[in-house]
Amino acid sequence: MALLLCLVCLTAALAHGCLHCHSNFSKKFSFYRHHVNFKSWWVGDIPVSGALLTDWSDDTMKELHLAIPAKITREKLDQVATAVYQMMDQLYQGKMYFPGYFPNELRNIFREQVHLIQNAIIESRIDCQHRCGIFQYETISCNNCTDSHVACFGYNCESSAQWKSAVQGLLNYINNWHKQDTSMRPRSSAFSWPGTHRATPAFLVSPALRCLEPPHLANLTLEDAAECLKQH
């Protein structure tokens, strides 16, 4: 749990925002951009507001600051999108605003959106880790909007039998991952070509799980895995 409480750390800057993966994003934000001219009495608000809307996706990823992959479930993406569109639609229902009001409200909605996305991603990971053993759930990658998944290991086992089964499942998962990773590398090459080596699953690279990192994966035993997890 301590690991989950400090997930807000670092993310790639060269990425897009999660909300742009929603099916209505283009339509909604096209409307918002084209109607920004009618929202303020002061002409200076127009370019500022337009820039906020244009850079919305890229700025979102820059502000997420997540140490875990920015992957969100479709259900939670729908919830976030619905909340953001409601706030934006309500803002656009008003007539012209006094100078400075409209861009400030856009910034407030933007910050609330970032907060909602952070919570959605972290809540899914916490729910996953409240299970017993290996669990995977389907997600959308905020980087490129492709279908993806997240794997985690949950410690919420109610009996020694469940715990043993969970550890065995983890061992099988790691061994299968290692075999697949090895098969992706060129046999005749002394080094890895770009794209031929996969990153270690995120839930295996926390500081508390050093014993599950390469090069230990290939020869990991059930006893070793159990001991490592007990230390965690």
Curated annotation (Swiss-Prot):
Residues 1-15 form the signal peptide. GO terms for cellular component: extracellular region; nucleus. It comes from the Eukaryota. Keywords: Glycoprotein, Secreted, Signal. Coiled coil: none annotated. Its main location: secreted. InterPro entries: IZUMO (IPR029389), Izumo_fusion (IPR052868). Detected in sperm. Glycans are attached at N24, N219. It is found in: Secreted. Belongs to the Izumo family. Izumo is the name of a Japanese shrine to marriage. This is Izumo sperm-egg fusion protein 4. It comes from Homo sapiens (Human). The gene is IZUMO4.
